[in-house]
Amino acid sequence: MPLNNPITSALLADPEIIQQNRLPFHAHFADQTSPEMPLAVSLDGEWAFHYAENLTAPFSDWDTLTVPGFIQMQSLQKPGQPYGTPHYVNTQYPWDGHEKLHPGQIPQDYNPIGEYQRSFTLPESWASCYLRLNGADSAAAVWCNDVYIGYTEDTFTPAEFDMTAAVHPGENTLTVQVYRFSSGSWLEDQDFWRMSGLFRSVELFTKPEIHLEDVFVKQDFTPDFSSATVTFDCKVSGAGTISVVFDGEEQSAEVGEPAEYDSGVVFGKGEADPDVEEDVQDVSFTFTVEHPTLWSAEQPNLYEAEIALLNEGALVERTGLKVGLRKFELKERQMLLNGKRIVFKGVNRHEWSCRTGRTVSREEMLWDVKNLKAHNVNAVRTSHYPNDPYFLSLCDEYGLYVIGETNLETHGTWQKLGADGSDEWTLPGARPEWRENVLARAEAMLERDKNHPAILIWSCGNESHGGKTLWEMSEYFRNTDPSRLVHYEGIFWNREYPATSDMESQMYTPVADIKKFLAEHPEKPFIMCEYSHAMGNSCGGITDYTEYAYEEPLYQGGFIWEYMDHGIAVTSPDGKPGFAYGGDFGDRPTDREFCVDGLVLPDRRNTPKMDAVKAAYAPLKITLTDTEAVIENRNLFTDLNAYDLVFASSVNGKPERRAVLRADCKPGGTEHIPFPFALPEAGLACMTVTAIQRAALPGIPAGYEAALGQVWHNYAVARLTLPAPQLVEMDCNVGVKGEGFEYIFGRGKGLVSIRYNGVQLLDDTVRPNFWRAPTNNDEGCAEPFTFAFWKTAGLYARCDNLTAETKGDFVIARANYTLPDGQTLPIDFAIDGAGRCDITMTWQGTRTELPEFGLLFPLRRELTEVSYLGLGPRETTADRTAGGKMGAWNYNVRQDFAQNTPVYPQECGSRTGVYSATVTGSGLNIGIGFAGDGMTFSALPYTPHELENARHLYELPRDDNKTVVRCAAFQRGVGGDNSWGAKPHADACFAVEKGTSFRFTIQK
């Protein structure tokens, strides 16, 4: 504990004290070197660490922790979790219910302090020494050799301090205290795990005799983009020569006696360090580029720039920059990139790693960017804070549009239990004591990230209601950087300052309501900053949104919530690997599994939802008739001739013919291309057209399948007629048998046995099924309550009567089921001499909606290999068929479940549009086949009820007890407009009425 410690609870709680001695913000330099000496030294690695529960509590014994990293994530790996655990809440604050607090107060009983300490030796060549904390959650104070250096808030932007006066030759001691809660915690109520620590890199750096303090690259274009002017506005300290090389041209200037440094707006009350003030001179260089190569997500062209600083002719500092030339503007109520109407096909992305929390490795960031590009995503909203600068550099390089979002969310100060409860405590509003705290966050982000071409829009934050302060922030963005637009969704909640946002931005609005809004309010372009809530098995109806972007010019796309599940990798008490979510560490209050709401699993495995995203966000829309392909080029800058168009026909999944064509079609155009050969007329005849990228682009290899379209027809196949099988009627059972097959129906039970070639295939009785394991979306709109009857209807349906007779070439057994409410359901089993069993279930009751309508087959455990003809290769649903491809597919039941199931167990694994399926098993030499006319099929290790009863995958029974096959006329769509009340769209809500029937076949 440092002897000189000015940090008090009052200081931490004061919203007007957000920094002490912090240096002015500036652009991030990813590439700054010197031939004379290292300009920076990383302090990442092991640090000494100890911990206290609050400001007055004693510290623990010294331990070691890794920097960068979160205290609580590393605590999970230690016996007894001595430094606390992560705490997940969504809108409510983590202290809610523990202490009664209002803005301007912070927890007293539980406000942990983590004190980090390490030694360092100053390089002999350094005449100055500065410290950079790239991320400290939520506030930090710094000492060097027991000399107090300074204090900072704002978790997600860098804080720099001058330590020159405190360091000495030889070994020095650096101490950093990190406070879990501060005044900034009221402004950081994002929907994520609450933790603390030095979670981004820590480094020392020095400044040579002449040093580039800052640079802002600005650009302008002629109306036809034939010429660009590029200006480098530089701030330089010291005296000497500055040289800028850009596009093959070099310009230089002498920097002499500089004017006194004007640091611009420095928000926040605090003590000024007289030794921090520097002399800085402004220098600008302007270049003209003829016929510039423009930057976009499709073609992320970057120019190289180099800024060299020389002292008496000797190079002392070199800074490399990558510059993307592009123009983003609002014109005639539309957002344009390089003169073209843009459509955002985006995701919201929290920073997350299942083992290290928001400390994300460069390898993970690169994987994310490549994965997004591989699924046709073109935009990212950095929800809800500035992301690591390396991620933004990857977006520049690989081509992703970015909404850079200010580290601001005050959701819990105004939204109470889902309703607008704004009052005098709502932040920031127009409360003067919070103004500079809020505005400083905008300045920190803009200054750090202003040179990234990927950033098209600055966002004022998330879900912080409205008011004057947010409007002032938007004006700061516009005045400082007019090359970008400003976004803020909160004007939806508070229309007092509508000019805060240049666009109308909403969350989770149904398409029908968007249409209505734009009909009444066509003043601005419209985006969905959050839509298609991806929690659990979700994203149904996503194409309704993407298609509307090409129907309504004012609707310019949106950002799916969200990219990744925020699960934490854990080992269950019985040794099984799994993922934890809110509440699993005893953290209360909590919002439980609401943090596992992403398109990819916590370990970055893609879920089937990503297949739908890739299809919905495709750069081409390919629609097939029976004779031609209609291709709509939705690119902004890429001609259709950048793709090979592969036409392929198949019958029953087997390839027939193939041809590769090319066509010219400008961006925004439509091309009609006749089939090079006819669609077959036998079996399941399918024509598939795929667009294959010809040349490699950043993140996308040559040969990448960018889009596809299909058309298919199922032609009936004549059956071989054989004599009827043998009917065996006894007191308790009815048997039907023939060569190589036997079915047994139990009186009072139904179908109890299926034997093919003498092998028993059933593990239990076949029964009607009307239930699916509730999804998160089902629970959010109370469908388990609404449809509760259907859970018991299938479980407890009673076979009251069984009849059997021979009719022509068939034996027909009829099982008459009575449901718990007295309704009846006859199921006919018509078995021919080959052992094929045509099953027809017919609804006799009144019209009603229900989750599923079909039969459940509990098969023996060995039957785990599935081959099917339908949409695949992975799960599709009634409202999420986009991304499914008609064809012949194979999977292992247990592996498919393990790879694709949501963290929170629920319905999964269904295949739609299935015409046939076969389930086999090793060692049995036999299997069972299912055939239907585009039915819904699933094969899982569990029943819907077993899935429903577990909260984590490791709570499920063993996965090798049985295989549960379900064949259904339909299964209700999964929905996804939101997870707290929205039902699936009407075309995915199915009903039965008197006479509704479902027919399919089982066979060996």
Regions found by a protein language model. Give the residues of each.
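Catalytic cores of secreted or luminal carbohydrate-active enzymes
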Residues: 190-211, 566, 575-624, 634-642, ...
